[in-house]
């Protein structure tokens, strides 16, 4: 159990997708203007990561890995296209669910919801799973931990950006300029976790 808690904490803080690896920056910067929208996108990314990492783990270990289907047959050259296909299918199902049951959130996320399919944080989580050779339970923990970490980062940035609306930001830094500086400072804060050995 300790191993899974350690993996979860590492995925959330030490190896944060947004602030340690800078993955998913497009949606991270664009949707972090309001906390409510950022939280909704964070939940969507967490759900997609939490489902796609274990699903791709099964596909990788049962189909793509060297000798998984037939001895001597290595289908690992299909990793990227297969991983993207599984992620796209999961995002399509999530998009239909949000459209049906949460139309306000669906409209607020707009074009960024289908873009989760090509969000490099999602693909990064799946690629790290394959590269680090996680087993199925580890991939579940890592997927949800990575999603929670990304959500924590985007909600924190959205909260800071909401407060900065009332700040006297210099004209040259208004908009994305101060957002990049804020993201960098947040990343420095999260870097302090890198010394933690779990």
UniProtKB/Swiss-Prot annotation:
One of its GO terms (molecular function) is oxidoreductase activity, acting on NAD(P)H, quinone or similar compound as acceptor. GO terms for biological process: respiratory electron transport chain; sodium ion transport. Keywords: Cell inner membrane, Cell membrane, Ion transport, Membrane, NAD, Sodium, Sodium transport, Translocase, Transmembrane, Transmembrane helix, Transport, Ubiquinone. It catalyses: a ubiquinone + n Na(+)(in) + NADH + H(+) = a ubiquinol + n Na(+)(out) + NAD(+). The keyword NAD applies. The keyword Glycoprotein does not apply. Its EC number is 7.2.1.1. Composed of six subunits; NqrA, NqrB, NqrC, NqrD, NqrE and NqrF. Belongs to the NqrDE/RnfAE family. It is a multi-pass membrane protein. It is found in: Cell inner membrane. GO terms for cellular component: Gram-negative-bacterium-type cell wall; plasma membrane. Its main location: membrane. It comes from Yersinia enterocolitica serotype O:8 / biotype 1B (strain NCTC 13174 / 8081). This is Na(+)-translocating NADH-quinone reductase subunit E. The gene is nqrE. NQR complex catalyzes the reduction of ubiquinone-1 to ubiquinol by two successive reactions, coupled with the transport of Na(+) ions from the cytoplasm to the periplasm. NqrA to NqrE are probably involved in the second step, the conversion of ubisemiquinone to ubiquinol. The chain crosses the membrane at residues 11-31, 35-55, 77-97, 109-129, 140-160, 176-196.
């Amino acid at each position: 159990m300790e191993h899974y808690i350690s993996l979860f904490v590492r995925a959330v803080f030490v190896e944060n997708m947004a602030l340690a690896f800078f993955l998913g920056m497009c949606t991270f910067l664009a949707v972090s203007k309001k906390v409510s929208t950022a939280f909704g996108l964070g939940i969507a990314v967490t759900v997609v990561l939490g489902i796609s990492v274990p699903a791709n783990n099964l596909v990788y270990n049962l189909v793509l890995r060297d000798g998984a289907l037939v001895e001597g047959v290595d289908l690992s050259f299909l990793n990227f296209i297969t991983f993207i296909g599984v992620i796209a299918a999961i995002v399509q199902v999530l998009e239909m669910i949000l459209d049906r049951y949460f139309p306000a959130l669906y409209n607020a996320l707009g074009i960024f919801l289908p873009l989760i399919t090509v969000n490099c944080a999602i693909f990064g989580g799946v690629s790290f799973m394959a590269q680090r050779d996680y087993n199925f339970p580890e991939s579940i923990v890592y997927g949800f931990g990575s999603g929670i970490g990304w959500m924590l980062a985007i909600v924190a940035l959205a909260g800071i950006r909401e407060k900065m609306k009332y700040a006297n930001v210099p004209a040259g830094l208004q908009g994305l300029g101060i957002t990049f500086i804020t993201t960098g400072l947040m990343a420095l804060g999260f870097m302090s976790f890198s010394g933690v050995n779990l």
